[in-house]
Amino acid sequence: MNERYELNKNLAQMLKGGVIMDVTTPEEAIIAEKAGAVAVMALERVPADIRARGGVARMSDPKIIKEIKAAVSIPVMAKVRIGHFVEAQILEALGIDFIDESEVLTPADEMYHINKWDFKVPFVCGAKNLGEALRRIAEGASMIRTKGEAGTGNVVEAVRHMRMINAEIKRLTTLGEEELMAAAKELQAPYDLVKYVAQHGKLPVVNFAAGGIATPADAALMMQLGADGVFVGSGIFKSQNPEKMAAAIVKAVTYYDKPEILAEVSEGLGEAMTGIDIRQLEEKDLYATRGW
């Protein structure tokens, strides 16, 4: 089991420094691959449309996932509802490369997340703080991403979550060994993982940024804040020029600390997605609060 998990962590590590894009058709997947995406997330609807449509959001139709898998040579991910291990079993049977247990879909279980040790396929999970990240890793997640607030085109929550996780990691590195057990209790996370973070100053898995990334500048901001890579959902195919936006975001992630290049790739992209002011959302419309 541990060998398998090490392999899964290494698979996630290979995506480091890259962009993972949400796609809803084989054509979009091809655009993403051409633009330099390291993986695609196969969906029926991007988060902005899920948000607009309302109702219950579930796993995508296997037909869509198969068509997208057939169209590209890069890894394909797909989302399942929090706690819905049968949706995960179906995705594993389809030969998906990564499963995202995602708060963007309507949670199926409000008490338990999926026990990811039951699966061979690697999982990615969202987190808004260190305790949440470590609980997901304890359940077998091979990759963490900020939750942000998907489908809003507003990066503020992703920034908040990344800063929060970084600050909590930094704090652990300053604690003496005798204080770590109390920290584990406070974080509601296993002691061995808390100890690992305290010793290494980082999570034991890669930590990507997600939720509200809409422009090359947003992507570079998350990288400068310490993200290992970025997920871009609605931001690409809800923009005026998806091909150009996709290529620009990939470049921005590669050259995140080179303002001259960022200025160049940000030019003439057309309108970014309209976006939503998060303060206008009601509590029930917030995705980041789903899961624990």
Swiss-Prot record:
- Is the keyword Glycosyltransferase assigned to this protein? no
- What keywords are annotated for this sequence in UniProt? Lyase, Pyridoxal phosphate, Schiff base
Reaction(s) the record says it catalyses = aldehydo-D-ribose 5-phosphate + D-glyceraldehyde 3-phosphate + L-glutamine = pyridoxal 5'-phosphate + L-glutamate + phosphate + 3 H2O + H(+)
Catalytic residues at 79 (schiff-base intermediate with d-ribose 5-phosphate)
Q: Which residues bind D-glyceraldehyde 3-phosphate?
A: 163
Any one Pfam family here would be: SOR_SNZ
Question: EC number(s)?
Answer: 4.3.3.6
Entry binding sites for D-ribose 5-phosphate: 22, 151, 212, 233-234
Pathway field: Cofactor biosynthesis; pyridoxal 5'-phosphate biosynthesis
Q: Which GO terms describe its biological process?
A: amino acid metabolic process; pyridoxal phosphate biosynthetic process; pyridoxine biosynthetic process
Ribonucleoprotein in keyword set: no
Tell me, what is one Gene Ontology molecular-function annotation carried by this entry? pyridoxal 5'-phosphate synthase (glutamine hydrolysing) activity
Top enzyme class, one word, equals lyase
Q: Which InterPro entries match?
A: Aldolase_TIM, PdxS/SNZ, PdxS/SNZ_N, RibuloseP-bd_barrel
Subunit description: In the presence of PdxT, forms a dodecamer of heterodimers.
Described by its record, this protein's role is as follows: Catalyzes the formation of pyridoxal 5'-phosphate from ribose 5-phosphate (RBP), glyceraldehyde 3-phosphate (G3P) and ammonia. The ammonia is provided by the PdxT subunit. Can also use ribulose 5-phosphate and dihydroxyacetone phosphate as substrates, resulting from enzyme-catalyzed isomerization of RBP and G3P, respectively.
Q: Which family does it belong to?
A: Belongs to the PdxS/SNZ family.
Name used for this protein in its record: Pyridoxal 5'-phosphate synthase subunit PdxS
Q: Which organism is it from?
A: Caldanaerobacter subterraneus subsp. tengcongensis (strain DSM 15242 / JCM 11007 / NBRC 100824 / MB4)
State the taxonomy lineage. Bacteria, Bacillati, Bacillota, Clostridia, Thermoanaerobacterales
